[in-house]
Design a protein with these regions (language model features):
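Phosphate-binding site of ATP-dependent enzymes
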Residues: 149-197
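Conserved beta-strand scaffold positions in the cores of enzyme catalytic domains, especially
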Residues: 41, 83, 111-114, 145
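Glycine-rich phosphate/pyrophosphate-binding beta-alpha loops
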Residues: 64, 142, 196-197
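Glycine- and other small-residue-rich loops at beta-strand/loop junctions that grip anionic moieties
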Residues: 61, 92-93, 114, 146, ...
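ATP-binding N-terminal substructure of ATP-dependent carboxylate-amine bond-forming enzymes
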Residues: 1-102, 106, 118-125
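Glycine-rich phosphate-binding loop of ATP-grasp-fold ATP-dependent ligases
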Residues: 21, 112-113, 132-159, 178
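ATP-grasp fold ATP-binding core
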Residues: 104-105, 128-145, 165-179
Length: 197
């Protein structure tokens, strides 16, 4: 028999990915209830950000800023409440694409060439040939991500990416498949291919 827990699912939030989080959080809550767990759903953007007193564990279904950037994780760690996912420091480092890139370079992990841009009047970098990928340095998923084929589309794409964050990472475009590997307690899980619809 599986132990039953009182789980609080954090969903929604105030990021650009709110709608996705509401859907995924509702699906998580349904699945947990089907397994016999007690479930409360809390939306930090709507309710006073507090946890029900009976909470034993928090399932993080928040996305983007405040959900994946270490802020909510830090708060839960301060409260001493166990939660799903990466700790506050790991979340903050992974969410910041520029800091992640530095860590990759320090550990000889290959990643596309890139430069940081924070000015709307910046021109395409001479060191990276087109096409370019522009993305906010601190946003989740593909929020504000733009594929720029040539200099003609540069200004519009840069303005869009900057609108979603104050700093943009410009990288060379690498054609290929998107693969991801989760890590659980230091053990790499099987490789999964991401295939957007």
């Amino acid at each position: 028999m599986v132990n039953q827990f009182q789980v609080t699912v954090l969903l929604g939030g105030r990021s650009a990915e709110r709608e996705v989080s509401l859907r995924s959080g509702a699906a998580v809550a349904r699945a947990l209830r089907a397994l016999g767990h007690g479930v409360d759903e809390v939306d930090p953007a709507v309710e006073s950000w507090g946890l029900p007193a009976k909470t034993e564990v928090v399932f993080l279904a928040l996305h983007g800023e405040y959900g994946e950037d270490g802020q909510v994780q830090s708060r839960l760690e301060t409260l001493g409440v166990p939660y799903t996912g990466t700790n506050a420091v790991g979340s903050a480092l992974a969410f910041d694409k520029a800091r992640s890139k530095e860590i990759f370079q320090q550990n000889q992990v290959a990643s596309p060439r890139g430069v940081l841009i924070d000015s709307p009047t910046s021109t395409p970098p001479d060191t990276i040939p087109a096409p370019w990928i522009l993305k906010p340095a601190t946003q989740g998923s593909s929020v504000g991500l733009n594929l720029v084929e040539d200099e003609v589309g540069w200004n519009v794409a840069l303005a869009d990416s900057l609108r979603h964050g104050g700093t943009v990472l410009c990288e060379e475009c690498i054609q290929g498949r998107e693969l991801t590997v989760g890590v659980l307690d230091g053990v790499a899980l099987p490789v999964v291919e991401v295939r957007p619809k």
